[in-house]
Regions:
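N-terminal amphipathic alpha-helix/helix-capping segment at the start of soluble metabolic enzymes
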Residues: 1-21, 28
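Acidic (Asp/Glu)-rich catalytic clusters
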Residues: 9-14, 40-47, 66-77, 98-106, ...
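Alpha-helix-loop-beta-strand connector modules within alpha/beta enzyme cores
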Residues: 10, 59-83, 127-150, 190
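Hydrophobic faces of well-ordered beta-strands that scaffold small-molecule active sites
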Residues: 17-25, 49-53, 80-84, 109-111, ...
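Active-site mouth loops of central-metabolism enzymes
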Residues: 18-35, 80-92, 148-165
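Glycine-rich, proline-tolerant flexible connector loops at the mouths of alpha/beta enzymes
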Residues: 26-29, 48-67, 115-127, 178-190
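Glycine-rich anion/phosphate-binding loops
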Residues: 34, 86-100, 126-130
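Conserved anion-binding
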Residues: 108-175, 180
Length: 190
């Protein structure tokens, strides 16, 4: 597989857009069967450059995320990125997750702070990371992964200080080692 930063660079140099898809882990075996049997084969006809797989609130789909990324890469030959969040993980646990990702041939990680499950407030895990920039730095020091970070053009929901502070947080992620920044296509589509 390829590093996503190299895919972006190649497309930019060629003056072409990068096409990627983001998938959520399945809730049922039937959903998984439909995804791999029908949905993904149909989407592959669009010629995506890569895909990413989300992590679930509070890391609730951790095992499934890595499994899906590995299967997309192995069965479809599509470069794929795993989302990874800080929430509810110590540094040691994150290290173990990264070991597993590397063992599965996963080369690209989207480093996120993460959202707590519905109804819960964000709280740093003791021995864990408080900010996505710390996770980015941990990944960079470890080596071996292409690193994506999240950007929030309309401002992060938890950043009360305003857009300028948001931009400073984004610059911090880049300075800590992020290779590229992803944003959502729509924040407010009304």
């Amino acid at each position: 597989m390829r590093f996503i930063r190299d895919i972006h660079a190649g497309k930019e140099a060629a003056g072409k857009p990068t096409i990627s898809f983001e998938f959520f882990p399945f809730k049922t075996p039937e959903g998984e069967e439909t995804f791999f049997g029908k949905t993904l084969p149909a989407l592959m006809t669009a010629g995506p450059d890569y895909a990413s797989v989300t992590y679930g609130a509070g890391g609730s789909t951790r095992e499934k995320t890595l499994e899906i990324v590995e299967r997309i890469q192995n069965d479809f030959g599509l470069t794929t990125m795993a989302h990874l969040t800080c929430i509810r993980h110590t540094r040691a646990e994150i290290g173990g997750i990264l070991d597993e990702a590397a063992n599965r041939g996963i080369q690209n990680i989207l480093a996120l702070r993460g959202d707590p499950p519905s109804g819960e407030e964000w709280a740093q895990t003791e021995g864990g990371f408080e900010f996505a920039s710390e996770l980015v730095e941990f990944l960079r020091e470890r080596g071996g992964f292409g690193i994506g970070a999240a950007g929030f053009p309309e401002g992060h929901i938890d950043c009360a200080e305003g857009r300028e502070t948001d931009w400073l947080h984004l610059v911090g992620k880049i300075n800590c080692g992020a290779d590229f920044v992803k944003t959502q296509m729509f924040f407010d589509n009304a």
